[in-house]
A protein has these predicted regions:
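Short catalytic/binding micro-motifs of nucleotide second-messenger systems
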Residues: 39-44, 75-87, 119
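A short pre-motif secondary-structure segment
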Residues: 46-49, 89
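Hydrophobic framework residues that shape the active-site pocket
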Residues: 14, 33, 50, 55, ...
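Active-site-proximal alpha-helical element of nucleotidyl cyclase-like catalytic domains
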Residues: 25-46, 54, 60, 77
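Alpha-helical scaffold within the catalytic cores of cyclic-nucleotide enzymes
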Residues: 34-35, 65-83, 112-114
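Catalytic strand-loop-helix junctions within cyclic-nucleotide turnover domains
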Residues: 58-66, 85-88, 93-111
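Catalytic-core segments of nucleotide cyclases and related cyclic-nucleotide turnover enzymes
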Residues: 23, 98-130
Length: 131
């Protein structure tokens, strides 16, 4: 166990947003989702775009506290809509979160985190799975 945890977040079915509304609208949604995520983080924690429609977060608090923050944020995102070209776009997100363990390398930590993310997707999306 450690003092920080790592989360990987994926915007669910994002290809459909791009296909239906176009890439400019999709990019706007990703920017807004990322900005909203940053507003929910405590001082010292960091969020960044991981690639495509994924974000990574490094939390400076325990996995339990971080999971609570992510759960609240995921429900917040699901209840919002984003406007692009006068069209309302709603999205949901799935996340996997894990704690960094001192005897594990970075690849192992990210592998466990990625496994938790895909478990969240398999379990129905719009949720956080902690590994």
């Amino acid at each position: 166990s450690s003092d920080f945890s790592i989360a990987l977040i994926d915007v669910d079915h994002f290809k459909g947003v791009n296909d239906e509304h176009g890439h400019l609208a999709g990019d706007m949604v990703l920017r807004e989702v990322g900005l909203d995520l940053e507003t929910q983080l405590e001082s010292g924690s960091s969020a960044f775009r991981w690639g495509g429609d994924e974000f990574a977060v490094i939390f400076t608090n325990s996995r339990g506290e971080s999971t609570d923050i992510l759960n609240a944020w995921i429900q917040r995102i699901a209840s919002q809509s984003f406007t692009a070209d006068a069209v309302s776009i709603s999205v949901t997100c799935s996340a996997g979160i894990t704690s960094w363990m001192q005897d594990e390398d970075q690849q192992g930590t990210f592998r466990r985190c990625d496994q938790a993310l895909y478990e969240a997707k398999r379990a129905g999306r719009n949720q956080v799975i902690s590994n």
